[in-house]
Structure formats: C-alpha cells, structure tokens
Design a protein with these regions (language model features):
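Conserved, mostly hydrophobic/aromatic
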Residues: 17, 50-53, 90, 105, ...
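Acidic-and-aromatic substrate-binding clefts and catalytic sites of carbohydrate-active enzymes
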Residues: 2-7, 25-37, 58-69, 91-100, ...
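Generic structural signal for well-ordered alpha-helices
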Residues: 10-14, 37-41, 69-76, 102, ...
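Active-site-adjacent pocket scaffolds in enzyme catalytic domains
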Residues: 80-81, 85-205
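Active-site beta->alpha N-cap acidic-glycine motif
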Residues: 1-49, 210, 225
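Extended, basic/helix-rich recognition subdomains
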Residues: 204-225
Length: 225
C-alpha cells in the first residue's frame, strides 16, 4: 500500500491538483520522505505545504513522552532539511493525541494541529490538561461518575478533522481493520461530501471545509474519477 501510494497515488493526485489549480497541505511521515525523496520533491516543487504526520505513523497514545518527543524531533528535522523550512502543521497519526502531545508541539513551534473533532467546520484554540475519569468496572461505580474537567486554552490552533470528510474509511481496504471498507465509489463519497458542503454553505457565513484524502485510496482510478 505504501509503495503504491508513493509511486502511483501521489503523482496522480499531483496531476489532479495541478489541473484544477488546487493548493493543498500534505501530512507526511518522515519515513515516507526518506524512502521516496524524488516523489516528495515533486510535492514541494508544486508549492504544496508539508505538515508532520509521525515518522512511521506511530500512535501517540502508545508511546512514552520521550518516544513521542524523539519521533517529533526526527520528523521535523527530516522535513526541514527536505523543504528548507520548519513545518508549522501537525496531523497526528490515527488522529490521536497523547496527554503530552500539545505541550510537545508548542515547544517545537508548531502553529496548528489537525487531528481532533470538538468542532467540525470552525477552527478553535486547543486546551492542555483536560481530565476525566476512566471507567473501571472492577471498582465501585462512584469512583468514575465524575464530570469532565476542561484544561487551559493555549496558543495552538485546531483545524478540525472529520471522519465524515475522510476518504479512507469508505474507500480503503485494510485486512486488519474491522471498520475498513474499500468498495464505496467516488460518486457515493462525492455525494456525502456535497451534502455536507451544501449544509455548511447554507448555515454558516464563515467556515472551513477540510477534506482528508490519502494517495493509497484517493489515488485509485475509481476514486479519482
């Protein structure tokens, strides 16, 4: 899947964007940049923004704070050397943030994240330090029946992601993922996205409409069409 994405999916999407004059942001892994430098050079040459997306698509929730910091530092270094400037955007692998992610991003000068879904069509300031009590069925119920406590807003903007504006769940087949599909047509996906866009256009005077596509799914002919 990864080799197809780099060798076939990326060039096809770049041709599509060039044909319609679309400028995009690519969340890329450091591993992909180092493995396929000639492919990713074309993304930069076409004027698209490069954001960080882990080194090997590591889940932040599965890492220690030191591991997460090392992954961020390595990926930022790879992209900075490749593009000639430090990335300012972050798209978390799996769209998961650990309790340490926000602080680590701010320490490294990241200006925005695009992984969370507290809103759907409007940017918002992220908070650091949200807390809630997890359910532990081995304990008395009173131990977890406590409200969520919001943390403090920080200077890190969230451009909200959305599973309903993501091509992967409906168009990408992955054997180990119970919710993967892969047999939804591009026309069906376009209809869902068009309905959302029409609703936003009618109900908001200001909004962002952030679509997420992947070269290993959107780069397939039946989706491109």
């Amino acid at each position: 899947r990864g080799v197809f994405a780099a060798k076939r999916g990326v060039p096809r999407l770049l041709n599509l964007f060039k044909r319609y004059g679309i400028q995009t942001t690519w969340g890329v892994t450091g591993h992909s940049v180092e493995s396929f430098p000639n492919i990713f050079e074309k993304i930069v040459d076409d004027g698209h923004e490069i954001g960080i997306h882990g080194y090997s698509h590591e889940n932040p929730l599965a890492m220690t704070s030191n591991q997460e910091a090392d992954v961020l530092d390595k990926t930022i270094d790879v992209i900075s050397k490749f593009t000639g400037k430090r990335p300012v955007g972050h798209m978390a692998p799996w769209w998961e943030l650990s309790p340490n992610t926000i602080a680590l991003l701010r320490e490294r000068g990241i200006k925005y994240d695009s992984s969370l879904m507290e809103d759907d069509y409007h940017p918002y300031w992220l908070r650091d330090g949200d807390s809630w009590t997890k359910i532990d069925y081995s304990q008395d119920a009173k131990t977890w029946m406590k409200p969520w406590i919001p943390g403090k807003e920080v200077e890190l903007i969230e451009l909200p992601a959305s599973w309903w504006l993501d091509d992967a769940p409906p168009t990408m087949f992955v054997k180990s993922f119970p919710n993967s599909h892969g047999w939804v047509t591009g026309r069906s996906l376009g209809e869902i996205w068009q309905d959302q866009f029409d609703w936003v256009y009618r109900n908001h005077s200001y909004a962002i409409f952030l679509c997420t596509i992947h070269p290993d799914s959107a780069g397939k002919p039946h989706v491109l069409m």
